[in-house]
Every structure is written in C-alpha cells, then in structure tokens.
Amino acid sequence: MNKLEKLRILLTVNSMKLNDLVDFVKSGDISVEEMIENGLNPATATQIEDHFKKEKQRLLTEEDMISRIRNYQKQPTPFLNWSDLPPLKSGFTDLYFLGQPGSGKSCILASIFYHLNQQGMIIDDVHNLQGTIYRNQLMDEFSYGILPDSTAAEGVNYIPLQLQNDDPQFKGRKHPLNFVEMSGELFDRAYKGGINDNSIAARNYLNNTNRKLLYLILDYHQHEKSRTVAMGTSQSNKLQAVLALLDQYGTLQYTDGIYIVVTKSDLFPYGVNQKEYAKNFVLDNFKGLITNCKNLQEKYRNRFKLIVYPYTIGDVRFQNMLVNINPESPQMVVKDILEHSFMTTNSGIKKLFS
C-alpha cells in the first residue's frame, strides 16, 4: 500500500466496512492507533480490538486441542449387536437417531453428551452398562477433539440416562431418557426390506408404549455433493419410506417430536442465519419429506412437533480433527428434549409432560 492509498483510507475510515478495516490491520498496512488518530469511531475501534482478542483466543484453543489430539490414545469403540442389548427401560422417553451411513449420527450424540456433561445435567443409569461406557468414551474423545468411529454395520447402542432439570419451575425433577443409535446400514436395510428384527425393530425397541422423539439426520455435505456425483437413492427418499414404515409399524402413535437435523451446517454459506438457512434448505430440497411429515402430523392431530435444526459439532480440520467445539447446536437440541420429553415428579413416581 502506498502513502496516497493509506491517506485516502485514513481520511474515510468511518465510512469503511469493519471487515475491510480488520484486513488492513491484519496485513500490517495500517494500525488501529493510526485509525484512532484520524478520527475512527471509538465503538468501531473496540470492535476491531475485540476481533483480534477473539482470534488470539481461538488460535490458543486450537493449539491446545491439536496438542491434546496428538497425545491421545484412541480406544476401540464397543459397538454391540441386538442380541447384546437388554430390553429398553419402560417409563422413559426413547430418542432414535435415524439416517444413512456417514450422516453424522455418532458425532451428534458425542456433541450432545459432551454438552450435557459440561452442564452437569447427566444422572447415570447403568441398566445397560455397555451403553454408559460407550457414552463416556464419546464424551472423553470429543473433549480431545477425536471424532467417533463410524458405527459398525450391525452396530446398535442403547444409552439410558436421566437429565436433571434445573429450571426453577421444575427444580429437582428428572427426564428419564433412552438414547438409541442404530448404524446407517441397519437404516438402509429397513428402507430396502421393511422394519423387522433384522433391521431396526429387534427386541421390541420400536414396538413399545414409551413416548418417542425421532431425529431424522440429513447430511448437508452429501446432498450438495450429490448435485454433481451420482450417489444412489437420495436421503429424502429413504427417510420418507422409513417414516411411512414407522407409521405402519405403529411407532408414530407414541411419538411426541420429529426433528429434521441438517448436519455439517458449518458448510453453509458464510454469514447466513443458520436456522433460517436450514429451514429453507429442507423446504427447497426435501419437499416430499416435509409433505409426508405434515400429512402424518394431521393424521395424528398435531400430536407431535416438527422442527428443523442446523447442526455443527464445530470446526473440523483435516476431515477428522475437531479443533473448536460448537456449543450452540447441542443447546438447541437439549432445550427441546427438556420441553418435549416428560419428567418425574419430585417423588419420582408419577410422570408428567414438560
């Protein structure tokens, strides 16, 4: 930058965009002090300084995370088969995460469990000890920036726990939950051959009277990639078919929420409102899925909620290195879990919807 250009910028400093001013400071062409001397608005100067403070903190966090990843020893993941699992606990709300292979189900669970643990909300339930071990491994590895292994082709995991509700209105009450994660291969098998003991319905996991929350996982990156690369049956077609099968199977009569989760939302265009973009993305690209969901809502007289979430676990580098954890996505999910599941009374006997 020559002296004339620098002078021109300093004379018009208050009419320039914040991002441009940050870039000038970052490049070393102009300092914040020089801008202030030439009349820069104090509020804008503070914004520039805050930007660099946050950037410095982010880099320190990334360096710490990368160091922890390098020194972490990955443990084998305890994936189970249907025959290894105990029956679901009755009187709990069942949460099912359904989506094709690689859609991000395990990463979502790791993110949610990490957030719950950070907030001190988890009350252990060892009805399925292997599920508790799996949950703890997800949380521990996530805290080190290690992403979960893909669920084994026949893999299922069932994690029972209770959440402490610290809302002053509900102080002392708990939300008993069964988290159920099934491999994408079992989901595909249900799409191809129906819901049965060889796909996602073994051991009466879907055929029970527990209230249910269903999470339909859409992979944003995979959808965008499919615009130019043939990838077989679309996510939407699979989810629509499995949703119809769940209706036929009788599962939806006990369902209180269907949540369409758009994963990898960190790949959305920069600067967009994530919630609005996710909603419009689904409305524009998954019209059939939305139509089917709304028809089922009408069939069951609006008994269940229909909500679209954007979801990102954070800043992922080199495909599998999590260097910055995003707290906002799990916060949204947990908020609705507390609102749409039921909870015990203080005596722990009668169940109430929250």
Segment roles from a protein language model:
Residues 57-86:
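N-terminal pre-Walker A segment at the start of P-loop NTPase domains
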Residues 114-153:
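Flexible phosphate/Mg2+-sensing switch loops adjacent to catalytic phosphate-binding sites
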Residues 95-97:
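Hydrophobic anchor at the beta1->P-loop junction of P-loop NTPases
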